[in-house]
């Protein structure tokens, strides 16, 4: 790059990319494998026939912000819409980060947090999770007191481990740090937590949305922002839509980093239609939870270590005798020598891919070495996945 002037932090980065791999069963990106409910698809189709594609969208996505604010009983100025919650996370790092600033993020967790911090010329500082992937409030509070970050990000439930951390533990953090706190709740709809903040009197028909979530703490803490997405539980990953809810003071600052018309009109229309009919997803979410728990229990029975999960995915790796058997099978088949933990995960990843099943490979991760992460698919897909994992484990033991 000697002929051009490029920011040093940008030049030092690698462009994010994921290899495109064809497979019959795709369970590597925590997407929903379900189509839109028929009723919602029909509503969208009816509007699309006469949709004003020639017009700009609402300049601040007010049409979607309004229905979310009404549902959560907050002022519309407490809500911001983004192209996925990822855009909002990136912009938050611009707003609250910058040269000389630190952004505290969990580790291991969503890898893009560090990318957003770097783009904002901020220093990423990583606070550790427990060995089982949980957030320890006292650890985070001490970490923030020592490092003095200008922004703290907590991923709950955590990706890629899947852990759900209690509302009490999260509130303890929010109440005891001196910086804005982002609660990234991309997977909260899948959590089984039924606890609520003390004296929460919201109507019962809304509790499924806020149960176990820091959304129930809105209004109590001025340093809190909660980020949610339509990509996971609601299956809109292809349209990119998410939202942030928090105090007016914080959300107003976040809005300054968002460009006019930054979310397209079609996405806003579909997301609004979906949000107004989100009750249609309740049974689907229950099914995904049940399938997730069944898969986790099955992997554990086969001899894998499974991380406690409250999401739409399961993260696991082989240990002990099973790890050695899979590692030996990998070396024999591919004539490649890797540490046993990494080799066992790589063997399973390749075996599934050879059977047209694509999962997420974490075998080279410095903390999650040997791990695979499998999104919960349709029930019939999950059966095929379990059958192929069983098949390989049986062959490896022979």
Task: Report residues per predicted region.
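PLP-dependent aminotransferase class I/II
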Residues: 37, 223-307
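Phosphate-binding glycine-rich loop
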Residues: 62-102
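N-terminal "arm"/small-domain region of PLP-dependent enzymes with the aminotransferase-like
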Residues: 1-55, 148
